Amino acid sequence: MVEKLWGGRFEASLDKQTEEFGASIKFEQRLAPFDLKGSLAHVKMLGETGIITTEESKKIAEGLKKVEEKLLNGQIEFKMENEDIHMNMESYLHQEIGPLAGKLHTARSRNDQVVTDMHLYLKSILEAVLEALKVLRETIVKLAVNQIDTIMPGYTHLQHAQPISFGQHLMAYYQMLTRDFERFEFNVKHTDMNPLGAAALAGTTFPIDRMLTTKLLGFEKAYDNSMDAVSDRDFILEFLSNASLLMMHLSRFCEELLLWSSHEFKFVSLSDTYSTGSSIMPQKKNPDMAELIRGKTGRVYGNLTALLTVMKGLPLAYNKDFQEDKEGMFDSADTIITSLTVMNGMLSTLTVNRVNMEKSTEQDFSNATELADYLATKGLPFRKAHELVGLLVLDCIKKGIYLQDVNLQDYQMLSPLINEDVYEVLKSRTAVSRRNSLGGTGFESVKKQIEEAKKELQI
């Protein structure tokens, strides 16, 4: 059995089951490059402050770089008996340079070491998420440009409400994802902080230079309080919260893609590249990727809830419970980056059935609001107009016709304010084109939304 680095005050060793229960190396392996980066900064600082000699600092750094090379070449075997990523890396360093490796941990604890690794890891993930979000937003804008004059039903309660521009519908998701982008950008602020040097919780008696390691690691600033530094997991919770909101938005979009691609809607068709078949039904084309994004949303929610539950009762400063902060973060990072990539692919290859979309608006009463507005512009109080149109819709339903099928004589019996121009008003395309209020679905309004988005994206 490997001798534990903390084993001096113990008379008995951990039994195998307990050792396995406490070990975290099975899921911490992805932190290895960040752990080595943190150690390289730490040992340089130790040398420059004279805590260890310049020669010792140089030899340890050379050893760390050899371990780093082995890691890149896939020559590192992570061992459970070394507990965690830090002890595994230090074990390999010891193989390279011998007992001198023990000086690396001067003025450092695994408490500040592990959270430094996590700040570095999450900072890199946030860069990837922001880039993937930018690409997806660009794809949505490009799709919207070609769908400004595509007419479709707008829905409330999943019932036809008013005709809208499909471009407008797409730009609503652009706005959601832009808010997601802004939240992740703000997440960077709280992630771009250096906890290294906080040691176990109280700082250290050694004359360390935390500003130097902050600079070497590329952090914006150092934590102001050593206890906060080792116990803070807000930056991860922010990430998981932002990830949950993002997945909720993607899930809503996927739900609509699933509806629109169904036989009953036939509004869009997903590429074969993002669909699968059935093992028994030869005709099936299943939108599995959209369903998977919708399904994976739950696991991201779960990761947020799990860490919130871990954190809610922890006294300052470090607790072993913190070992449970990583797997959910890793899983959510993988999930959202993959989901963004798949979503981008689905939208980039989406086929839009413009004819079916517009035809659907001609077989409903989504133009009823246009008729009520028409009467209101003629001087009739809107509430009265609403009542009259409602009665007319009921009569049309009984007769099996739509508002555009009502003859002018019947219209004028409803209200003498109605003239022949009402038929133009009732057209879906006219209805959409007239709604050019700020943020509205009118063609000119949607064009303005797209132009603003292009400026934001610099495309």
Curated annotation (Swiss-Prot):
Domain of life: Bacteria
Keyword terms: Amino-acid biosynthesis, Arginine biosynthesis, Cytoplasm, Lyase
Any one GO cellular component localisation term in the record: cytosol
GO biological process terms on file: arginine biosynthetic process via ornithine; L-arginine biosynthetic process
EC number: 4.3.2.1
Disulfide bonds: none
MF terms in GO: argininosuccinate lyase activity
Pathway: Amino-acid biosynthesis; L-arginine biosynthesis; L-arginine from L-ornithine and carbamoyl phosphate: step 3/3
Cellular localization per UniProt: Cytoplasm
Catalyzed chemical reaction(s): 2-(N(omega)-L-arginino)succinate = fumarate + L-arginine
Pfam families in UniProt: ASL_C2, Lyase_1
PANTHER family in the cross-refs: ARGININOSUCCINATE LYASE (PTHR43814:SF1)
Family affiliation: Belongs to the lyase 1 family. Argininosuccinate lyase subfamily.
NCBIfam families associated with the record: argH (TIGR00838)
Name this protein carries in UniProt: Argininosuccinate lyase
Gene designation: argH
